[in-house]
């Protein structure tokens, strides 16, 4: 995760831009594991004291077979022995999926999936990158995998089976899981662990010019990631003055907040709204987030599982919080903000802060929309827990297969728990009532 060079790689890449749909490729999409699943499995691994290992597949894409006929010119430096001067007149038929092909990631996904299914694994219905078997689970993100089981011998046996099987997977055993997708996983005392990304934060600070290559800085830090008030379009404001790419900064901050820093979610989302035409005020907001990260670069989320607590969801909404009289004609300013966090055994596994897509007409309606959106994540999560429970127990002292939702708006609670008809709420779309049959 610190960006240190481990090894040099030489890759032959295809020109995927020259491919034609229906001729040299069909489907291209391949899923990756949800971060919710990663955090949930790490919490369960800690609760039950399970063993875990990470593996990395070497040159993953070329290990997969192609599903269509693709021909390629000879790469520069390769000649035909019989007639070297005519080498450019020859072509090669590809047998494996090269980097650069549009379907390369999908071919690799199917290759690994078939190899795991042949070894008795079953893919999850909720997360297709989670595989379950007996007392073992495996989750994958392209070519990086985490294997969890009560027995380290079973994990080693699976790794050897994949290396020596008919697929002849080329992989490296990375040992204990101490990093995954650039996230540091640090085991602490008292059965707790921490998720952090200090090296990504260093990269962000260097990108924004807040520190040098030695991470020395004379910039002032900020106590909070966002200033008082909300960002607006600011078309009459001053133009940008910084040279760094605005969208790149937003992308790095978005990955950081989605992985280990939920407290910057709202601030990051505000800046992301104006990626198309940022002004100086929007740049200053990003710089404020950077200054906040200066003093908190080594901080992350500390997970201390509490087995007395099960699945819980905390919900809140900010009704038309962006409205201002100075910019009252902008419809986006009256959108309410959704915010919720889902906890399992007192460990945060999912958090969201975003604007609602419809204009709510009251606080109760804004809260109800937020409640509905949060339960779109909760309901499949319950199914995911049931799937994992077939491999190893996920029960804590309170029932795990129900979710306690914390909502403080009484009108919203009434709408969610009763079928009482009200002329003031009949306009609420059917899609927000989807969870009512689950309420108890």
Language-model-detected regions and their locations in the chain:
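Metal/cofactor- and membrane transport-associated sequence elements
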Residues: 1-139, 144-164
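Divalent metal-binding acidic/histidine catalytic loops
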Residues: 12, 29, 38, 137, ...
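Short amphipathic alpha-helical segments embedded in low-complexity Lys/Glu-rich regions
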Residues: 58-59, 128-133, 176-181, 271-273
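A short alpha-helix capping/helix-loop junction motif
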Residues: 87-93, 177-180, 265-268
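Polymerase palm active-site segment centered on the conserved acidic dipeptide of motif C
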Residues: 119-126, 146-201, 205-208, 213, ...
């Amino acid at each position: 995760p610190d960006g240190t060079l481990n090894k040099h790689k030489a890759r032959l890449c295809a020109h995927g831009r020259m491919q034609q749909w229906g001729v040299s490729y069909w489907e291209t999409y391949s899923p990756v594991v949800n971060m919710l699943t990663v955090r949930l499995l790490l919490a369960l691994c800690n609760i039950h004291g399970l063993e875990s290992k990470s593996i990395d597949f070497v040159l993953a894409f070329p290990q997969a077979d192609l599903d269509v006929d693709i021909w390629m010119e000879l790469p520069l430096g390769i000649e035909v022995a019989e007639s070297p001067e005519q080498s450019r007149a020859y072509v090669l038929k590809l047998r494996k999926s090269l980097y650069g092909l549009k379907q390369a990631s999908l071919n690799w996904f199917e290759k690994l999936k078939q190899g795991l299914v042949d070894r008795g694994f079953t893919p999850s219905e909720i997360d297709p990158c989670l595989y379950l078997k007996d007392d073992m689970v495996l989750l994958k993100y392209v070519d990086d995998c985490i294997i969890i089981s009560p027995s380290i011998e079973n994990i080693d046996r699976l790794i050897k089976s994949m290396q020596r099987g008919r697929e002849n997977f080329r992989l490296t055993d990375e040992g204990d899981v101490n990093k995954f997708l650039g996230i540091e996983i640090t085991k602490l005392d008292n059965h707790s662990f921490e998720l952090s990304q200090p090296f990504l934060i260093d990269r962000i600070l260097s990108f924004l010019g807040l520190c040098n290559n030695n991470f020395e800085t004379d910039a002032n830090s900020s106590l909070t990631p966002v200033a008082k008030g909300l960002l607006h379009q600011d078309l009459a404001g001053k133009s940008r003055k910084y040279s760094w790419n605005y969208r790149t900064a937003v992308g790095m901050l978005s990955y950081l907040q989605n992985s280990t820093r939920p407290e910057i979610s709202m601030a990051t989302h505000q800046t992301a709204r104006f990626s198309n035409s940022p002004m100086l005020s929007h740049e200053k907001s990003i710089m404020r987030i950077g200054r906040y990260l200066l003093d908190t670069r080594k901080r992350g989320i500390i997970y201390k599982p509490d087995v007395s607590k099960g699945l819980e969801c905390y919900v809140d909404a900010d009704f038309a919080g962006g409205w201002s009289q100075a910019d009252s004609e902008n419809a986006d300013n009256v959108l309410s903000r959704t915010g919720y966090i889902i906890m399992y055994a007192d460990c945060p596994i999912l958090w969201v802060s975003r604007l609602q897509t419809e204009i709510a007409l009251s606080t109760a309606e804004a809260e109800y929309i937020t409640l509905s959106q949060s339960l779109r994540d909760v309901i499949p999560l319950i199914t995911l827990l049931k799937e994992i429970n077939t491999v190893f127990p996920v029960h804590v002292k309170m029932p795990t297969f129900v979710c306690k939702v914390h909502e403080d708006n009484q009108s919203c609670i009434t709408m969610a728990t009763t079928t009482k008809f009200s002329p003031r709420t009949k306009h609420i779309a059917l899609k927000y009532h989807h969870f009512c049959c689950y309420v108890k």
